[in-house]
Amino acid sequence: MLCIGNSFSWDAVEQELAPLCDAGKQPIIIGNLYYGGCSLEQHHTFLIKDTAAYSFRYIEHGVRTPNEGYSLRQALRLMQWDYISLQQASHDSGIQSSYEPYLSDLIDTVRAYQPHATLCWMQTWSYSQDAKHPEYPRYQKS
């Protein structure tokens, strides 16, 4: 499974999924390609410019191999992935106009490199009513 995301993918994949797979003795290879706070627009910019700005953790049998300075294309070429997840930044996840054209272009690129992979969407969780995140007012605190 390859996750293309930000710190939320780090939380969900490295802190939750990897230990569950290890505990259940399910063989799984996880690639977590992340850039803190990364939006779909930023992922798209990194893709277009082929920017090696990501941290990439390769996890196999519970062993994490960290890599810095990875590009999205590098991760897509690394191996045949069964599942690939994409994710919007939490501060943009409720803003419909923040998805396109970036998401469609990212999907097209993923499909070009990994035509047999199942695409997944990692939905971030909402902020609490008393959240102090600077982007939270965009949602009228709801």
What kind of region is each of these model predictions?
Residues 2, 11-100:
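Conserved SGNH/GDSL esterase-like catalytic core that processes O-acyl groups on lipids
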Residues 69-142:
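Alpha-helical cap/lid subdomain in secreted, periplasmic
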Residues 2-4, 122:
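Short hydrophobic segments within beta-strands
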